[in-house]
């Protein structure tokens, strides 16, 4: 893997469901603050990181990644800020949110942005499998190509938890940031 800087942002505790979701989901009576969260990342945190460390500032050198609702948020941010985030890591993303809003967004969106995407899910995540597979098919339909700018993985028996995501972290980092010969 190529040398990189990882910046981890706390998950906001109780406000996580609001801050990590792009739309209000009336069924859950929550959500819809992802754009505000994205503004913080794009206009406060990333400039601070770029100022504080020696970074490569291009989108092709910058990723956003997350698991569960953080995966939903990361895809939304990649789609809405492709000039900032050129790589997206989606570990067990919450595709189910707001009746699969993110899949509908991709289906009706215009030109697909130039993003390199890692998408995975555990086969032990019964609730997540169907939506993640649907998202995978939509990404293919929109022009992403396996092995080039998309990697899809179903981790055998993996559950929806930090341990499972941690076990896949090296894999997704190697795909998004491969070592250059």
Where are these regions (language model features)?
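Non-catalytic cap/lid and distal C-terminal segments of serine-dependent acyl enzymes
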Residues: 1-181
């Amino acid at each position: 893997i190529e040398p990189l800087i990882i910046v981890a942002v706390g998950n906001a505790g109780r406000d996580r469901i609001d801050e990590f979701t792009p739309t209000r989901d009336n069924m859950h009576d929550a959500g819809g603050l992802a754009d505000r969260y994205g503004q913080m990342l794009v206009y406060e945190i990333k400039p601070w990181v770029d100022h504080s460390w020696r970074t490569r500032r291009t989108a092709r050198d910058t990723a956003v990644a997350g698991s569960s609702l953080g995966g939903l948020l990361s895809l939304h941010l990649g789609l809405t800020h492709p000039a900032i985030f050129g790589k997206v890591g989606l570990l067990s993303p919450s595709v189910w949110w707001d009746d699969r809003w993110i899949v509908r967004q991709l289906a009706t969106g215009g030109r697909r942005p130039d993003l390199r995407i890692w998408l995975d899910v555990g086969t032990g995540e019964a609730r997540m499998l169907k939506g993640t597979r649907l998202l995978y098919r939509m990404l293919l339909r929109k022009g992403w190509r396996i092995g080039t700018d998309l990697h899809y993985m179903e981790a055998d028996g993996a559950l929806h938890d930090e341990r499972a995501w941690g076990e896949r972290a090296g894999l997704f980092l190697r795909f998004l940031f491969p070592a250059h010969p």
